[in-house]
Each structure stands twice: as C-alpha cells, then as structure tokens.
Amino acid sequence: MKGRLTAIKNIAWAFAIVICLLAVFVGLLIAAFTRSGEEQFRAVPLGTKTTVKEEVVETGTRPADQSDGTLKTLAETTDAGQEYIDSLVFLCDSTLIGLRDYGILNGGTATTQVWSTPSGVISARDMADSKIVYPNDGSMITAANAAMIVQPKILVISMGNDGLGGIDQFEFMPIYKSLIRSIWENSPNTYIICLPLSSVTVDYAGNDGTTAAKCSEANTWIQTVCEETGAYYCDAMSAVQDPSGVLLQEFASSNGKTLNSTGLNQILQYLRYHAVTMD
C-alpha cells in the first residue's frame, strides 16, 4: 500500500513539473512576440522626422531638359552657317509651312527637314497628338514617333498660331508641354528650340479669333512652358514684327498670317545668328 502511494506521489510531481515547464515555455513565447511587436510598431513621437526611401529612376541625358525655372534664350552668336540650317528639323503649323511648300530648305519641296500635315495646318488644340507627314516615306505618324526614328540633333517648334482664337492659357500650356515631353521621351538627346508666334498683320481679316494681342499673350505662355521644361526660347519672330508685335505686311502672305518667302528667309537668318552651342 505504501509503495503504491509513493508511485502516485511521484507521478503527481512529474506531472506538476511538466506543467511548470509548459508555463515557462509559453511565457517565453509571449515575451518574444511582445518585444517583436513593440520593435515593429513602436510609435514615432510627434515632431520626429521620418525618412522615406525613394527609388530614383534614371531617364537619360537630355541636353535641353535641364530646367532650373529660368528662361533659356538663345543669345546672338557668330554666323553658324548654312550647315547649321541644314541640321535643323522644323515641326511647324501654317506659319512656317512655306519652308516646305516654297522649297526654301535643302531638298526643295521634297525636304526632309519639315514635319507638318499635308495642308500645313495644325490646330493649337491638336499640337501634342496631331499626325504629321513623315517625309522619309510619306507615312502619317506623330511628331514623337518621328523623333524616335530620326533622333534629330535640333528640333525647332513653331506651333500654336492655328486655331489660337479658340483656346485659352489653361488648355494651351499643358498641350504644348505634353508635346515637348513626348518628343524628349522618344529622343532624349534632341535640343528643342521653341519659337514665338508670328502674329498677324494689322489688317488681318480672318474669322478665327486670332489677333496680334492674343498672339503676344500666347508668347508668354510659350515662355512659361520653356521655363518649366528647359526647352530653348528663340525670339526669331521679332525679325518679322513691328515693336508692338504685329506681323509686318512685307513678310506676310496674302492671308495676313503665314509668312511669305521673304519672311521665312528672315527667320532662317535670325536662327543662323542665334544658334545653339553644342556641349
């Protein structure tokens, strides 16, 4: 009988020891998880600065996309020569379409230096996504796609005159900015030169709402876009305007808006003496 009681007592002690060990083990687990949770979710006191790690994506070298918030203009230079003019590509609306249609540039009317529509008209509202005639094969593609193929060294943009009367600053600027950025996305090493609007003559009789005052206002929009993107602004149209910004009759075609051959040659001359200096 005594031996049986001793055996029962030993079993009870063993059971108690197991229970104690389990309790210690559970306690250690709880402590470990609590410490981990505190370290992971510890509150940051108000006023404490936290640092968020950002991923930096390199977009490539863009010679003109170096905006510091200032307007980059082209100062007067020595004569860059005909070779410089031959290196330019013009993305233009009806203002400069005579460069192609009058055969003024290298290649005559078949020049590959002018990107525009068959008619030469591109509405200001359609600047960013209008399709142009790709002169190398005659296909209709966007200017951004043409830039991707050609990778032009210098692209001169002369757009915004067509349909200007029906668009305001808040629509014009994002569209113009989108055009520039789409070109750089496809041709990051291209220097972009933006020209102001040529304006209209004092007796312009068009019914599109375009006036000399509206053109002067739009030129400030283009300047702001250049400041924000880093594109160059070249005041070439001053060569064909009077001091008030009105297009001089001697440089205008019969419609009082687009440039005639004399006016176009004035623009080319201005560009020759206000050239981009390559890095």
Predicted region positions:
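Conserved SGNH/GDSL esterase-like catalytic core that processes O-acyl groups on lipids
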Residues: 78-171
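Active-site segments of SGNH/GDSL-like serine hydrolases
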Residues: 160-162, 184-216
